[in-house]
UniProtKB/Swiss-Prot annotation:
Subunit note: Homodimer.
GO biological process: NAD biosynthetic process
EC top class named in words: ligase
This protein's encoding gene: nadE
Protein name: NH(3)-dependent NAD(+) synthetase
HAMAP family: NadE_ammonia_dep (MF_00193)
Origin superkingdom: Bacteria
Disulfide-linked positions: none
UniProt keyword annotations, A-Z: ATP-binding, Ligase, Magnesium, Metal-binding, NAD, Nucleotide-binding
Amino acid sequence: MTLQQQIIKALGAKPQINAEEEIRRSVDFLKSYLQTYPFIKSLVLGISGGQDSTLAGKLCQMAINELRQETGNESLQFIAVRLPYGVQADEQDCQDAIAFIQPDRVLTVNIKGAVLASEQALREAGIELSDFVRGNEKARERMKAQYSIAGMTSGVVVGTDHAAEAITGFFTKYGDGGTDINPLYRLNKRQGKQLLAALACPEHLYKKAPTADLEDDRPSLPDEVALGVTYDNIDDYLEGKNVPQQVARTIENWYLKTEHKRRPPITVFDDFWKK
């Protein structure tokens, strides 16, 4: 088995999908989880206005709507969390995503004050954060807020990780990567677009250039620039297609060096890290 085949198997990626079937699969997955653990009353998700959180948010609200109708349990809710750092550059996209999702509840937590306070406390301890590490601080502060909300609403935190993100480890460890349940896992980027199209999502929300937008020195830096490969390259690779050798090498290097992000903390029983 080639490394490409191993990666595809590990991430559960498929060369092609039926959008309606995958929507149903994700919604039923979320419903089944909530029914298995009836003490869970809410799904909590940060909404950025980008493709992934828009899709995950819509699926969450669909699951909650169906469960309420089927069970009569009105205590179930989906909580969409706005998490700007100061003023969000693509504020209108976020508002458009909220309008599309129609969440039961929308909360806004501006993380800038908390991030700056943490940075100042570290500075006083003799640690000066780089712009890149400050970006990770933002991602972790966002997740901290979501877990606080989940803790106070008997909820779980929903993630947006998918195969095209997981393969490169393009998420912050214990930031946006630290979630309870990931309904998009297995899909690549173009497949996520297919689901949103089937759900009649406004096109600009999934045709915009993806960006983590964590670095102050490089605001709105496109993911594809940071990764050195395009999502079309990554999706082709995940679909088992032949890609240029340099592209495959870049993707596989990302996969191998970020393996620790896709695993729980390393113990004496692990050997994946040994060379």
